[in-house]
A protein has these predicted regions:
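Secretory targeting and sorting signals
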Residues: 1-26
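Secretory pathway export signals and precursors
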Residues: 14, 49, 91, 171, ...
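Active-site catalytic motif of lipid deacylating hydrolases and related acyltransferases
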Residues: 28-44, 52-128, 299-326, 333-341
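Sequence contexts marking disulfide-bonded cysteines in secreted/extracellular proteins
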Residues: 52-54, 174-180, 246-248, 287-289, ...
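Loop/turn elements at helix/coil->beta-strand transitions in domains of secreted/extracellular proteins
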Residues: 61-64, 90-95, 124-129, 151-157, ...
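C-terminal catalytic-base region of ester-bond hydrolases, centering on the histidine
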Residues: 204-342
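Polybasic, low-complexity, intrinsically disordered segments
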Residues: 340-374
């Protein structure tokens, strides 16, 4: 684990294409980090319907928390039986967001829901919000920060559980012959992951707490803070920490980490309780004596966890399937934006020329009409 201020900007590369190509064949120049975010393409009615909040979010006395589910999950599976009751007990306002195709569609589309959620919660609360996300849900907010800069000043803590920040090596095998668009995008060699981490991984003003487990069988590798979930550089204040560094005997896997693990819970609550990211040394060893986080009803736990597992399985069975990664959106790459601006400039010039020709034709008709009268 390392808690530190990290800064630095990665080098740029040459753009050759705006659409999906193999990373080895062509390099890409990404949009600058200060490029204003694009307009959202998802209908506002769908964005609004996706966000469910407690009433205390409006004018909140403390930072409300946005709960973002992982791939194959909805808030019902990820949070309804664990994190939502836990936050209620602590008096922390929260919202959860339901993403298209059970968080298995194009992650770039899902990111628009996150952008809307951040903006909506910030406006309602009148203050910065915090985010807790599992797996893809831990990575998604970073796409929002990267390509919608206005969201950066709206977020205090960004907390990821087993976040797929650098993709996973397992996607190569899971996606043979095909898999969901989101799974394709979360391959460690995908264009999406390269774009996500382009130029800088974090941004000043946001505290990043990235919690991972050495027993993660989905997001790999995650043996130390050079693994997939950890983030580095860019100016954000960062804690990358394995639950085993706090509780060495904790054997939670990928799913347990983001839904029920007590060590992960303690680290997240510590992060929410003071400025900056989690400080692992603040977590008492007594946390290690109970594997289940507060908020879980131990009487109904067997039924709750079974229901969640069935829900994940049913969602994954309904997942759309593709053999290729969705192409990067135009706003991601610099030359695509430049090409679009050039095309739009030409279109404006053509319209102006047409208006000029129409005006000239009108003048000629007027002169002809005057000659006939005389």
């Amino acid at each position: 684990m390392r808690r530190r201020f990290l800064s630095g900007i990665g080098g740029a590369t040459l753009l050759l294409s705006c659409f999906l190509v193999t990373a080895s064949a062509q390099a890409i120049t990404y949009a600058p980090v200060d490029q204003p975010g694009p307009a959202l393409t998802v209908p506002q009615s769908a964005l609004d319907a996706s966000l469910v909040c407690t009433g205390s979010v409006t004018g909140a006395a403390r930072a409300p928390v946005l709960l973002v589910p992982g791939t194959g999950g909805d808030p019902a599976q990820n949070y309804s039986w664990s994190w939502e009751p836990a936050l209620n007990k602590l008096g922390i306002p929260w919202c959860d967001v339901t993403l298209p195709d059970h968080t298995q569609g194009d992650v770039q589309v899902a990111a628009e829901y996150i952008v809307n959620a951040i903006r909506t919660m910030y406006a309602r609360a009148g203050r910065k919000i915090s985010i807790i996300g599992h797996s893809q849900g831990g990575m998604l907010p970073r796409w929002a920060f990267r390509f919608w800069p206005d969201t950066r000043g709206m977020v205090d803590d960004d907390i990821g559980f087993a976040a797929s920040n650098h993709g996973t090596t397992g996607a190569k095998f899971a996606c043979m012959p095909g898999c969901s668009p989101a799974a394709q995008q979360q391959s460690d060699t995908s264009q999406f992951i390269a774009a996500l981490n382009s130029y800088q991984e974090t941004f000043p003003g946001i505290s990043y707490t990235e919690v991972f487990t050495h027993f993660d069988e989905i997001v790999t590798p995650n043996s130390d803070d050079t693994g997939s979930s950890s983030v580095h550089g860019g100016g954000g204040e960062i804690t990358n920490v394995a639950i085993q560094e706090v509780c060495p005997a904790d054997i939670s896997d990928h799913l347990a980490l983001g839904t029920q693990d007590n060590t992960a819970y303690a680290l997240a609550i510590d992060a929410l309780s003071h400025p900056g990211p989690a400080i692992p040394s603040n977590v008492p060893m007594s946390v290690c004596t109970d594997p289940l986080m507060p908020g879980i009803n131990k009487t109904t736990y067997p039924a709750d966890v079974a229901s969640a597992a069935i829900g994940f399985a049913e969602n994954e069975a309904d997942a759309p399937s593709t053999t290729t990664e969705p192409p990067l959106k135009c706003y991601v790459t610099a030359s695509c934006l430049e090409s679009r601006a050039a095309v739009e400039g030409k279109a404006r010039k053509c319209k102006k020329q047409k208006r000029h020709r129409a005006a000239e034709a009108g003048k000629r008709r007027h002169c002809k009409h005057k000659k006939k009268r005389h």
